[in-house]
Each structure stands twice: as C-alpha cells, then as structure tokens.
C-alpha cells in the first residue's frame, strides 16, 4: 500500500488490537486511530500525490464513478486487516497440524504431495476468517429456514468447510485432499481480494519448510486468540529441525 516503513509495526499492531483486544474500549480506540491514519493519508496525498496506491484509487474516486473519501478509508482499513491477520494464522495452523501428523508432513517433505495442494487443506482446516454476515434484501429460504427481508444471516465457514455432503472424511486432516471446495475465502461478490496473494504466501512457506526442515515438533502448548472473527494462534512453541 506504499505506507512509510516507519509506520508498519504501529499499523500492524493497531490492526491486531482492533480485531482481537479483549478490551472493547481498546478495540474501538484502535479502529478510530486506523481510520484517522488513513483519512490523513488520503488528505495528505491530495496535496502531494506521493503515494501511488492511494493516488490510483483517489484518481478513480475523482472520476465520478468511484469511491468517496469515506469508502476509500474503509477499503484501506479492510485491505490492511484482511492481509495482516489471516495468512499468518493459516501458516501457524498448518505448522501445528504438521507437528501433530508427522505422516502428513512426510508426504509433503518427500514430494508425494505438492505444497500448493497442501495449501488448500491448510486453508480448509484453519479458517482464519470464521464467519461472514449478510442482510437479506428479499425473502429467501436457506435450507429449512425462512429468512425475512432485513434479517441477518451468518455463515460459519468452519462448519461449511466440514460439510459431510461436500467433503469425504471432513474431520480428517489430509494434505493430499483433491477437489477441496473449501470456502475459507468466502464466495460471491465479496470473495477475498487477497486470495491469490495468500495462496502464494502459504505455498512459498511450505516450499521453504520442505527445503530447510526435516521435522516439526511442538515443545509447548499452542495458545489461541479470543476472537470469534479473525481466529488463530498467537503462540506456537515449536522446534523445526
Ligand atoms: C488465509 C488468508 C485469508 C483468508 C482466510 C481470508 C478470508 C476472507 C474472507 C472469508 C473474506 C470474505 C468476507 C465477506 O464475504 O464478507 C475476505 C475478504 C477480503 N479479504 Fe481476505 N482472506 C485472507 C487473506 C487476505 C489478504 C492477504 C488480503 C489483502 C492483501 C485480503 C484482503 C481482503 C479484502 C480487501 C476483502 C474484502 C473484499 C470485498 O469485500 O469485496 N485477504 N477474506
């Protein structure tokens, strides 16, 4: 996003706090600080035009068909949040499962399963974005439920990813699973903007691990965050040999 290097640590920590702080006040404060940061960036960039990413979007905003300042700020915050938490949770969850299932690790290490295939199982299994919500614009039936206009519907992605009608042995972690139709990136109009980048990162991680490491072992209890939205491991004491 072309943000100054000096701001990276601060903005990364603020994003984690905005989603995962146990204190509601700190979550709200962190969100406000992030919005103010991006609002200042948009205004500053109007003057200097120095940030290419912001300039690209503000140019579209100015064309009459694009985004308002408020929408720009929300989108910046969304891209930041989407990119910051999620991918690292899949990497950590994959590492944990590979430590728990040395047989699965060997399948990757010995070349039986390509890292890009194992990436999909890591995504199905880890579910860093736990749910998405939509508001019904018209009456609709979902399964056995009638949904009235204006009612909200939440889909729990972890549940969908273990749907026995879609996945064989859904509770089995199988790095070689094929036809892996998980919905970890959501679906439809708001499907994850960063899914290609995330897949690239996770596959690169597995390739690096395969090249550098013979075994993955835990040496302490995994510790998860307390969020029901962006959920994942905060701590994973492990030995990579
Ligand atoms: C394992 C990694 C990731 C997972 C599991 C994930 C998950 C998701 C999910 C479930 C949604 C849909 C939200 C909805 O339908 O309401 C979404 C949207 C989005 N993601 Fe990701 N994401 C990941 C990585 C990333 C990365 C790396 C970026 C950015 C660099 C990113 C940026 C976004 C953005 C901007 C949206 C909103 C798209 C829209 O509303 O049109 N995500 N993501």
What are these regions (language model features)?
Residues 1-241:
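Cytochrome P450
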């Amino acid at each position: 996003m072309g943000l100054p290097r000096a701001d990276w640590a601060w903005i990364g920590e603020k994003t984690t706090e905005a989603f995962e702080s146990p204190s509601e006040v700190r979550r709200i404060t962190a969100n406000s600080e992030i919005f103010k940061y991006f609002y200042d960036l948009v205004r500053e960039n109007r003057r200097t035009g120095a940030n290419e990413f912001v300039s690209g979007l503000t140019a579209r905003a100015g064309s009459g068909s694009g985004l308002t300042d408020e929408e720009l700020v929300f989108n910046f915050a969304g891209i930041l949040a989407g990119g910051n938490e999620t991918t690292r949770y899949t990497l950590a969850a994959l590492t944990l499962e590979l430590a728990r299932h040395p047989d699965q690790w060997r399948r990757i290490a010995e070349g039986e399963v390509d890292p890009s295939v194992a990436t999909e199982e890591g995504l199905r299994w880890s579910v860093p974005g736990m749910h998405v919500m939509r508001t019904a614009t018209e009456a609709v039936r979902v399964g056995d439920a009638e949904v009235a206009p204006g009612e909200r519907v939440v889909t729990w992605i972890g549940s969908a990813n273990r749907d026995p009608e879609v996945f064989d042995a859904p509770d089995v972690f199988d790095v070689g699973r094929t036809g892996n139709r998980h919905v970890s990136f959501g679906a439809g109009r708001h499907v994850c903007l960063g899914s290609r980048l995330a897949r690239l990162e996770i596959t690169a991680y597995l390739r690096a691990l395969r090249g550098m490491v013979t075994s993955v072992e835990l040496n302490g209890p995994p510790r998860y965050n307390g969020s029901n939205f962006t959920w994942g491991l905060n701590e994973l004491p492990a030995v990579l040999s």
